[in-house]
């Protein structure tokens, strides 16, 4: 429960003029039955024969065999994250066991030992599908989401080892140390012989999946400084591109942060997430620039990408044409 209350305090402190009215914000415990129900559904997707959780399932929890029986990396990590949070809210030990199953499958089958980094997709039997495919920052970051949550809940040193192994792999292979273009590259070849591009995913998803959690868990200045660098990337490049767009910001970049104008889609959830991350970082490393940018990002969605009749933000826009 305390994590919900901490989140509400963060929101109220960052945007003090807002008075929550939702019953789920006023009493976060109301959300626990929903979390319990969601987690219970996904327990049925576990493969008790070969381990891991299927990726392609229908609304009833049946595997959609025609789509493939693959068990994608981020399915395992996100399932582990969800199960851990459900355990922390409900105390249901079975959810922690399910999270353990997901991570054990990842550790056994999704890590590329010869080259470092995580494979994108695994077949039912634990073999990597297309092991020489590109490795993306999106996958490398999200692989750490469930591991970090499990370590937070249990302090299991084995999971810490895998968490740091994954983090160091991204630092060694995806981080661009150039003072003029620092940031995470968006993708690399399977053996990391070539890396390229920058993106929203490579930048902002690093915060939510691992860097923020690592700083909260350790207080280590290594992760604090990384948060500052990623916040600078948001301010300089994502937020910095907003004034020249009809809506949203540039999401795809060349390696030197020049815009990739072959991709003009902007996603409202990404704009909101960037503001959310700046707000979270501001709670730990106060900077008025973070708050000002967060307010502008949220206002852009509310003013230009929000359904004021039925509620909720729209999803995708062309940033140039609106």
Where is each model-derived feature located?
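Short loop/turn motifs at secondary-structure junctions
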Residues: 2-3, 49
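Sec-dependent N-terminal signal peptides
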Residues: 3-13
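Glycan-recognition and catalytic cores of secretory/periplasmic carbohydrate-active enzymes
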Residues: 17-322
